[in-house]
Amino acid sequence: MGHILVKNLRKSYPNRRLGRRGAGDPYDLGGLMHILDIPHLEFQENEMVCLLGPSGCGKSTLLHIIAGFDQQISGQVIIDGQVVTGPSSDHIFVFQHSGLLPWMTVWQNVELGVRQLKDAKARQEKIQEYIDMVDLTTFEQHYPYQLSGGMQRRAELARALVASPDVLIMDEPFNGLDFLTQMKIREEIVNMHELFNKTTLVVTHDVDDALLMGDRIVALGGRPAQVIFNRRLEFSRPRDPQKNKALADLRDELFLMLGVSYAI
């Protein structure tokens, strides 16, 4: 489960700059700004897909549409044969800023993912299992403000996975984290993906994150945003561009495509 098909997707917003752009500009649709134009995009079951692209190109908008938060679109998103008409527990969204409820403890936040489980004993066992899995044992009764940024992100990951979704959607999961914490969370996300085999979509600005994590990399670019790169990575993990020339060449290709002439 977790096959995703995007068909004839177009997304527009009211154009507050109407009259400032030239006639015939494809970005200007007579009072609307054309943001996304994706005729066909497919994510296979159990893939981890990393979405790359410059800031403001529509990556997060695409994730919101796939998650069912934004239905003001033309076209369809189909998950496992069903047209997405709104949010669902089958596809869980992890926001780029902490989505933990501040008045709830770690335990209570994770419990939100299994509210439908009626058996109290089974529910408690499952909550503890996932808290232990993300290395937050002994922090069950802590509130979000008592946790570091990385710990908050792990709690969000536990809450998402405990719900057993078919699709896990993550919008910039490393946002606001220091470099070492980013590396740790990245490793945990990859490990969780390999353990649970969930279709996982991750928005990132970091080419290296995409290369190290993704089974597939999709890049958006242009205005309106279109798919300008879509490739499955046939590299085993762990990956190191410094030791793999093909991976290093792909890294350079992605930097150039995103408008960076060299990698620092």
What are these regions (language model features)?
Residues 168-171:
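Catalytic Walker B motif of ABC-type/P-loop ATPase nucleotide-binding domains
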Residues 52-54:
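The feature captures the beta-strand-to-loop junction immediately N-terminal to the Walker
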Residues 104-111:
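Short coil-to-helix segment of the ABC ATPase nucleotide-binding domain corresponding to the Q-loop/switch region
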Residues 143-147, 151:
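Conserved ABC ATPase signature
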Residues 121-139, 191:
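Conserved ABC ATPase "signature" region
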Residues 67:
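Helix-to-loop junction immediately C-terminal to a conserved catalytic motif
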Residues 162-166:
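A short, proline-enriched helix->beta-strand linker immediately N-terminal to the Walker B motif
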